[in-house]
Design a protein with these regions (language model features):
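Membrane-proximal, glycine/serine-rich, low-complexity loop/turn segments characteristic
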Residues: 21-122, 127-133, 168-175, 180
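Outer-envelope beta-barrel architecture signal
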Residues: 33-39, 73-79, 131-137, 173-179, ...
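Transmembrane beta-barrel strands of outer-membrane/channel proteins
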Residues: 39-45, 79-85, 137-143, 179-185, ...
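Outer-membrane beta-barrel translocator domains and adjoining extracellular loop/strand segments
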Residues: 49-56, 90-96, 146-154, 190-196, ...
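Residues that define the transmembrane beta-barrel architecture of outer-membrane proteins
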Residues: 58-64, 115-121, 155-163, 221-227, ...
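Short, flexible helix-coil linker/hinge segments at the edges of structured domains or between repeats
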Residues: 93-105, 182-223, 246-256
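Outer-membrane beta-barrel "beta-signal"
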Residues: 169, 452-464
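Long, internal scaffold/assembly segments composed of regular secondary structure
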Residues: 211-331
Length: 464
């Protein structure tokens, strides 16, 4: 098996590690001079009130990253390291590091300044075993810490560990099979100064304010196992992935919860290759389900029960040009449907929401300068218990306003524009400057504080 085949499947398996350089890696030869190293620093700002309920009205962030890919005669290695510092003001709602990921949530409603630090480390290798077989492994560790030092003071420490061994069979340079097993562990440990001022969300913002006046701790952990099967040829590829999850959350002041879940995703992609342009069609499907069970104080039965089921369907078309400044142009159509059911005695509720999004994008290249542009528009519809949102009853055990703001952010009609400009500095070797910018606008607002959101990031990097 030639190393180009190994690199091909390294790009397929570890796209995050390779930083999106799959197309370039496919053309590499087994030559040490083709090894890649990248380093960069960046800073950015986000501002605007068209945002999730947990996000800052204004935030700044800065970070540094380094990535490398090395090729030997029979093996390839890759690795990356990054750090990010973020500070935002007027932050409230979820105390978790990734709000909405877990089916249980802890909320607070006093705006304040929150800071966060993220560290990411990953690495992997792929080795030729002979007789058209190759094996490899990918590993990644993420650590994050956030803290709020005023009003309801709290801090959160999170760790995510992921390991994915893989086995590859390559029939030739353009066709092969990949099988991957994945294991992941995700934990978050919350420390809250006064739990009595926090609201425990047991699903759809139903729950209760907590009792107690002393410090409290709330820990959440989740294990997941997954299997992936991937087939790839020159013009066709397909993938099926299944993930099984089981999590637990507990704390003396917060109660005990279990939350099993599963995810099934698949895609097929067909390419039509020509001398001057390639045409690619991609159809993706994803189904997620999370359940939440709260154990009663006596250990018998449940006092809360919620269920989230989501389905996403995406159709994407892209044309890649081999000549001229316009290198690619494409259209992406996305449709998703979510259902959430919550039982918090004595209430049973059901929410259904549907969202559609259309995105057009184009890529230009001239004199080493790269320009990517995109525009999008979308809208959604949702109903709570089959009623319109104006008919929702405001009950003491539900944070209705926070729920309505979050639903409006997800479902309101919107438009957006964005782009990325990368300019090389030839006089300093591989030095480059990159500017990314996005603008989002809500076309209808009732509960959110504003209709605009602007994001800008400036990066200075060096490709060795």
């Amino acid at each position: 098996m030639r190393l180009t085949s190994l690199v091909c499947f390294l790009a397929l398996l570890f796209p995050g590690l390779l930083n999106g350089q799959e197309a370039g890696l496919l053309r590499m030869n087994p030559d040490k001079r083709n090894s890649k190293t990248h380093a960069g620093v960046w800073g950015g700002i986000e501002e605007g009130r068209f945002k999730p309920t947990h996000a800052a009205v204004f935030q700044w962030s800065a970070g540094a990253e380094a990535q490398a890919v090395r090729h030997g005669q029979k093996s390839s290695w890759t690795g990356a390291l990054s750090f990010r510092q973020t500070t935002g003001n007027n932050m409230l709602s979820s105390m978790f590091l990734e709000p909405g990921y877990f089916p249980v949530n802890l909320l607070e409603f006093t705006p304040g300044v929150k800071s966060r630090q993220d560290v990411h480390l990953e690495g992997g290798f792929l080795s030729d075993l002979g007789y058209e077989w190759a094996a490899g492994i990918q590993g990644a560790v993420d650590g994050a810490h956030s803290a709020k030092k005023q009003d309801l003071r709290h801090s959160n420490l999170g760790v995510r560990l992921q390991v994915e061994p893989t086995l590859t069979y390559v029939m030739d340079d353009d066709m092969g099979f990949v099988t991957t097993y994945g294991f992941a562990l995700r934990t978050e440990s919350l420390s809250v100064e006064n739990p009595g001022a926090a609201f425990l969300d047991k699903g759809m913002r139903y729950g209760a304010f907590l009792a107690g006046s002393g410090p409290g701790a709330f820990s959440v952990r989740e294990f997941s196992h997954g299997l992936t099967g991937h087939f790839h040829s020159e013009e066709f590829s397909a993938q099926l992935k299944w993930i099984w999850k089981r999590g637990k959350a507990e704390g003396a002041e917060f109660g005990n919860f279990t939350f099993p879940g599963s995810t099934v995703s698949a895609f097929i992609e067909q390419a039509f290759l020509a001398d001057e342009a390639d045409h690619r069609y991609r159809l993706s499907y994803k189904r997620e389900r999370d359940q939440l069970r709260e154990t009663a104080a006596d250990g018998n039965g449940f006092t809360a029960d919620s269920d989230r089921v989501g389905r996403e369907l995406e159709l994407k078309y892209e044309t890649r040009f081999l000549r001229g400044a316009l290198r690619s142009i494409g259209l992406s159509l996305d449709a998703s449907r979510w259902e959430e059911r919550s039982f918090v005695s004595p209430s049973v509720d059901l929410t259904k929401r549907n969202l559609g999004m259309a995105t057009v994008f184009a890529s230009f290249s001239a004199g080493g300068i790269l320009l990517d542009l995109h525009a999008k528009a979308g809208t959604g519809l949702w109903r709570d218990r089959g009623r319109s949102r104006d008919e929702i009853e405001d009950r003491p055990y539900r944070q209705t306003v926070d729920w309505l703001r979050q639903m409006e952010y997800l479902m309101t009609p919107r438009i957006g524009l964005g782009g990325s400009l990368k300019v090389p500095i030839p006089s300093v070797g591989g030095l480059f400057v990159q500017l990314d910018a996005d603008w989002h606008r809500a076309l209808k607002r009732t509960y959110m504080g504003g209709t605009n959101r602007e994001i800008a990031t400036l990066k200075v990097g060096y490709d060795f």
